[in-house]
Design a protein with these regions (language model features):
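N-terminal glycine-rich phosphate/pyrophosphate-binding loops that anchor nucleotide-derived ligands
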Residues: 2-4
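A short small-residue
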Residues: 16-22
Length: 167
């Protein structure tokens, strides 16, 4: 299988926040932003694998600043790492105030997707071609996150087998 470059599947999606997106506190509801993060990441995973993909985990989602009605959000999504059937996508969310021009980094997330064949089973994905120093750094960090996720999963399985071993 031929490798693919990160820039060939990366996307930036722009969306203006509207009154229907607001929570009772007057900020854009976090769930609205989460859905758009998942959508942007899914586009990247599907562009890389050229098949259906499913979100299997959100490793981390951090909200840094509130988002308001009228803000133009940019969801910048790109692959960080691929495994045999899985892909980690990083998403950076920036909000632009259309009146002042101020741009704020409002959220970041890491999502893992699995590619599916026509029968809904995991299928192999193309290898990732990592070119720039930034891509290499993000790839290393993604591999570290993957190792931590696998260790956590192993610990959870052990706890289910022997609840007394978990304190």
């Amino acid at each position: 299988m031929t490798g693919k470059r990160i820039k060939d599947s990366s996307v930036t999606i722009a969306q203006v926040m509207i009154p229907q997106d607001v929570n009772p506190a007057g900020n854009v509801h976090g769930g609205v932003i989460m859905k758009l993060i998942d959508t942007a990441a899914a586009v990247v995973a599907s562009r890389h694998s050229r098949c259906n993909t499913v979100t299997v985990s959100i490793d981390r989602l951090d909200f840094h600043y509130p988002v308001f009605v009228g803000d133009l959000l940019f969801f910048k999504a790109s692959l960080n790492m691929v495994g045999r059937t899985s892909m980690e996508v990083g998403v950076r969310v920036e909000a632009e105030n259309l009146i002042t021009g101020e741009v704020r980094h409002t959220a970041s997330a890491y999502l893992t997707f699995v590619a599916l064949d026509k029968d809904g089973r995991p299928r192999a994905v193309p290898p990732l071609i990592v070119e720039t120093d930034d891509e290499k750094r993000r790839n290393r960090e993604a591999k570290t996150r993957r190792e931590m996720r696998l260790a956590e999963r192993k610990q959870e399985e052990q706890c289910q087998l022997d609840p007394g071993s978990c304190t």
